[in-house]
């Protein structure tokens, strides 16, 4: 996020500010290992290969974000991409906060900051994510995100449990959030 975007985000009441001591930033390839570790240690996310997190930091940096701590190390991350058939939709793939930094509002600040950047720079109008019914933290995070931005949420099962090859995988419920209004002064 540039200084101008941070000023814009700070002026909007619907943007949760990044907690003191942290900085919102675009991920770099060098962050891939730390992001993989945060995802692994979350115990809630489906862990991808370490290689995929390196690729994510290279190929999807514009639609992802990290919160850096005082030592510039990633303390939290959110990964996303634009849907190929709906390029005005940001799909949030994963979001997690390192255990040492939980309870400070980093996930909400990352989600707000990334969405504000994607609306301004990429013309995003809606956000999608999938969440399993048993993931209370993510369900609360995205419900409060929609409420903070005064946008509707539509929920429907995207992938039923029977589609997954492993036993015991919960269904993935699609959360369609938006539409968001393009803020005044944005590039779109």
Language-model segments: what does each one mean?
Residues 10-48:
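Short amphipathic alpha-helix that is part of the acyltransferase structural core
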Residues 40-70, 74:
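Active-site rim helix/loop that mediates acceptor-substrate recognition in acyltransferases
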Residues 66, 73-83, 89-91, 96:
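Conserved beta-strand in the GNAT
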Residues 83-92, 102, 121-124:
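A conserved beta-turn-beta hairpin within the catalytic core of GNAT-like acetyltransferases
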Residues 94-102, 131-132:
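A short, internal acetyl-CoA/4′-phosphopantetheine-binding micro-motif in the GNAT/acyltransferase core
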Residues 97, 103-117, 140:
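Conserved acetyl-CoA-binding loop-helix of GNAT-fold acetyltransferases
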Residues 108, 133-155:
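Conserved active-site alpha-helix within GNAT-family acetyltransferase domains
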Residues 118-133:
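Conserved GNAT acetyl-CoA-binding A-motif
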């Amino acid at each position: 996020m540039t200084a101008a975007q941070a000023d814009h985000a700070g002026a909007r009441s619907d943007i949760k500010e990044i907690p003191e001591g942290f900085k919102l930033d675009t991920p770099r390839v060098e962050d891939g290992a730390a992001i993989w570790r945060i995802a692994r240690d979350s115990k809630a996310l489906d862990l991808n290969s370490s290689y995929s997190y390196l690729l994510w930091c290279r190929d999807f940096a514009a639609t992802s974000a990290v919160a850096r701590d005082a030592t510039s190390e990633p303390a939290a991350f959110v990964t996303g991409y634009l849907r190929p058939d709906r390029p005005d939709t940001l799909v949030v793939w994963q979001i997690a906060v390192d255990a040492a930094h939980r309870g400070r509002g980093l996930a909400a600040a990352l989600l707000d900051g990334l969405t504000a950047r994607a609306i301004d720079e990429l013309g995003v109008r809606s956000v999608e994510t999938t969440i399993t019914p048993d993931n209370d933290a993510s369900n609360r995070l995205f419900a409060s995100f929609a409420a903070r931005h005064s946008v509707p949420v539509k929920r429907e099962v995207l992938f039923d449990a029977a589609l997954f090859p492993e036993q015991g995988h919960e269904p993935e419920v699609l959360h369609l959030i938006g539409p968001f209004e393009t803020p005044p002064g944005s590039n779109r």
